[in-house]
Structure formats: structure tokens, C-alpha cells
Amino acid sequence: MKILFVHQNFPGQYRALAPAVKAAGHEVMAISSRKETDLGGVSNVTYEIKRSSSKSIHPWLVTTESAVIRGEAVHGVVSNLSKNGWTPDVVVGHCGCGEMMFMREALPHARLLGFCEYYYLGKGSDVNFDPEFPSAADAPERCHARNMHLTESLLSCDWGVAPTNWQADLFPENLRSRIKVIHDGIETDRLIPDDNAWIELGRDKVKLKKGDEVVTFINRNLEPMRGYHQFMRALPEIMARRPNARIVIVGGDKVSYGSPPPNASGYKEIFLNEVRERLDMSRIHFVSHVPYPTLVKLLCISAAHVYFTYPFVLSWSML
């Protein structure tokens, strides 16, 4: 069969699946916003955004318009592929960004499988979960509007997939009944204990190995949605109780979810400064982002891995 994967940051959730499908003998191609022509052995076709969002659009529709723009771009790429003789039998794609929105119109006879990562709720999930960071008064309405393109994408699919029961259960019943729970999977051939693992923190020249008191905190970015503020506030007591502990913090100083703080691009320094005077900074290591093999080694030597989150998409670093 000819199988097309669609994800703006391919491979994303399909890092293991796409190569496995190709290895099984199927023709595999990807469409993404990335510029590379080969991603993990899979041919990639780039879609280009040819217009920006409207400046005067209603604020509740900003995400929807962005999704329509992406959907239009992907529709054009898929149509060109078909005109040039490559029409997929199956399309596997993420429903959250609009790329699957017009796939049925472009490929009326293909089987469509949508990835259903998150359905936004005005209450009962991340909205107003943390009283320290209350959501905007119109958050429920924004959530409702934000689901429009996701709902439309899923309705055009033959089936949907969600990685956890909790994520699937966020969807209304008429949509939930279309979704199967199939986790992304864990690379158990790579993510295994290693008693000989060690890392050296380049700037600090500190070598850490299995058996050391290493506490890890890992996220794409250090922000309230993933509990960075709670972790930093716990550090003074953790370090006082464990005078030999080393704290390794992985993550950037931007915002992946929610709003940035006033007059800053990220939250790192805000919550570090809140407790800095009670910390032994020589035992705290902010390493920003690290290569995946280094991340695996770090998890192998970690004595305590701390993971916090609002009720939201489960991070890969948790698993």
C-alpha cells in the first residue's frame, strides 16, 4: 500500500511507526512543514504557508484560521502528488493543527486515520487548574472555538487514535466512539537500565554516574503548565535534606503552552530568583536541551525523576 503520514513536525508521534511501515514493504511518504527531503529514511514533501493570519480576525478564531491555512497548504501538496501519479491508500495524520481538515476532499477514496491528542475543555482539565495562573475570563469560549477544526478533521476521518484513555475521554461521546486508544509506544530496546551509564556536564565538568544522588526534571520548556514553579519551590528543602544531591534540569526558557510572563520570554529566571538565596547553585545544573542519547543516559543515572503537569497531554519524558 501507499501510506502518507502528515504532521507539521514529522516524525512527531510517528518516529517509530513510519519507518516500521516502510520496512514492512509499503510505500511511505510524509508531508510536513520541515524543509528536509528525508526524515529518518522517509521521503518528506514540504508544505509552505503562503499567507499569515488576519490581523483583524475575531480573537476566538485565530487558531481556527491558522488551521484552515495549514489545511489549505496540505490540500495543495496532496493534490499535486495525486496529479503526478502518487495517490495514497491510507493517510495517517495529526488532527490538531488543521493539516487533516481538507484531506477527504483531496483524497475521497483514501482511508484516513487521525491522531487525537487533545480536546480542549472550558473546565475539568487545564483551564483554571492552577489558581496562581487563572485563565482568561473567555477561556471556555476560546476552548470551544479551538476545537472546531479538530472536530471537523476527526469527522472526516474513518477512525481516530489517542495515546491514553484520559486523552480519548476528553472528546464528546459522539466523537469518542470513533477513537481507539493506542499508545505511541516505548522503545524498549533503547530505553533500558544501564548500570554503566554516566554523563559529564560540559560547562561544570561534573561527572555523574549510576548511584549518585541525581534528581532530574525534564521538559521541552520550563513553564507552569509542566510544574516548573512547583519544582523550584521544592528545591530548597530537597537540597537541605540531601546535601549530596545534584539537580539536573533539562528544558528551554520559552513557553510551549499558555501565555508568556510579562516582560519576559520564559519563566526560568522568575522562579529561580524566587528561591535562589536558599539554594546551593553549585549543585544545580541547567543544561537547556540535550541530544536524545544524552537524555537516555541522564534518565539511566537519575535517582529521582520529577514530573509535574496540569491535566494535559502526557509528556514523553514521563514515560
Question: At which residue positions do the language-model features occur?
Answer:
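Acidic donor-binding loop of glycosyltransferase active sites
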Residues: D158, C300-V313
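Short N-terminal targeting/anchoring amphipathic segment
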Residues: K2, V78-C97, M103, R111-L113, ...
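Acceptor-binding helix/loop patch of EC 2.4 sugar-transfer enzymes
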Residues: R51-L61, H109-M148, D189-E200, K209-K210, ...
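Conserved donor-binding/catalytic core segment of Leloir-type glycosyltransferases
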Residues: E200-R226, M232-E237, I247-V248
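N-terminal subdomain of nucleotide-sugar transferases
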Residues: M1-S43, V161-P163
